[in-house]
Amino acid sequence: MLKDRMVRAKLRKSFREQRPISYVGKVTAFNDYWVVLAGKMVMVCRNQSKGVQVDAKPANYVIPRDGIESIAVLPDTFDINEIEVMTDGQQFKMIVKNGTDCFLGELGEG
């Protein structure tokens, strides 16, 4: 279903002080328990000038399905090397050309 699609997977927060984390990339494997993604991690951080920290190099991530809060399907043309983030009021959003912008977290989090 999601295999070979570009997605943004936002993880659940286990406790209030936890930083919001999302993974952006191509799904390489998908089953009832795991999602395997080849992409980059995006984390909301107060100490960063842009408000978010993006991995410099792509990597493979194995994410448990019950740890995922939401999955947004991105256009196949989305380039993970050109991730742009904007602020919309109190929210950090990832800019998606030819698609809907994705929520990453809020200003006070992280």
Give residue spans per PLM region.
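Conserved RNA-binding domains used in RNP assembly and mRNA/RNA metabolism
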Residues: 1-110
